[in-house]
Amino acid sequence: MSPIPMRSLVRGFKPYTAGLSIDEIREKYGIERVIKLASNENPLGTSPLVQHTLETHVGLAFRYPQAGNPRLVKAIAAHHGVSPSRVIVGDGSDEVIDLLFRICVEPGVNNAVAFMPCFGIYTTQAALCGVELRQTPVNADFSFPWDNLLKLVDDKTSLVFVTTPDNPSGYTPPVAELETLAKALPDTCLLVLDEAYMDFTDDEADYSLAKRLDEFPNVIISRTFSKSFGMAGLRLGYAIVPEELADHYWRVRLPFSVNLMAEEAGIAALQDVAFHDETVRV
């Protein structure tokens, strides 16, 4: 048989390394009782309202979800006080990040920038898309060396990723530093603030630009339902982006990538404020 046709960069590609599931741990180490903390899953499980919603809608699993998930988009927009035209959703925030690379960065021309270490999806998807990802190490105390980051940025930089709160350190830069960074970037560069853990901060306004996006047209806020909402297994993420980018996102996103169960669960999760708040308190 002739060699299977394959892009050269895929041969020897280093995949994302996920944490082991409980079943894998039991099988590998021969133990029954496993307390899993490695993947930052919600210790309270899944919202009772989300569970009820899934039970109610499981009979509709034969249906395709509505294109563009407009009910979910509207619920997320209301949650953040933004226009639905700025909200995009994906099969986990992984899909959102992947499509940002595919939409915003021209392979061989543009580049992206991030700190090191960073969320593994940045490196895998940059590599898969043939995009140069420039990185600089965080400081010894895990704080962010902004000057070093900005030295990597040039007129060909399309995306700058900052994870805040950072994982695994938990370091969270004050909002004033994010303001300075956003203003220092070229007009042609987008600042992606990956806020998967932002719900766990004491006062979001001290650390996030999510409520001030009208002041910063080059800022994207990315979030997930996996952590504080306890829905990691359903794969649901979203971002608040400039309207023009949202329009192009919906053009290229795979149809129905957010399934009907995840959509209904996401809407319910936003309604169960008590569960969310108890998760944050714990």
Can you say where each PLM-predicted feature lies in the sequence?
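Short glycine-rich anion-binding loops that position phosphate/pyrophosphate groups of nucleotides
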Residues: 40-43, 93-94, 119, 164-168, ...
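N-terminal "arm"/small-domain region of PLP-dependent enzymes with the aminotransferase-like
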Residues: 1-63
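Phosphate-binding glycine-rich loop
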Residues: 62-111, 129
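PLP-dependent aminotransferase class I/II
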Residues: 68, 218-282
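Active-site pre-lysine segment of PLP-dependent enzymes
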Residues: 127, 144-156, 168-191, 195-228
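Short acidic capping loops at alpha-helix termini that bridge into adjacent secondary structure
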Residues: 33, 83-87, 108-111, 156, ...
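PLP-dependent aminotransferase-like
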Residues: 103-162
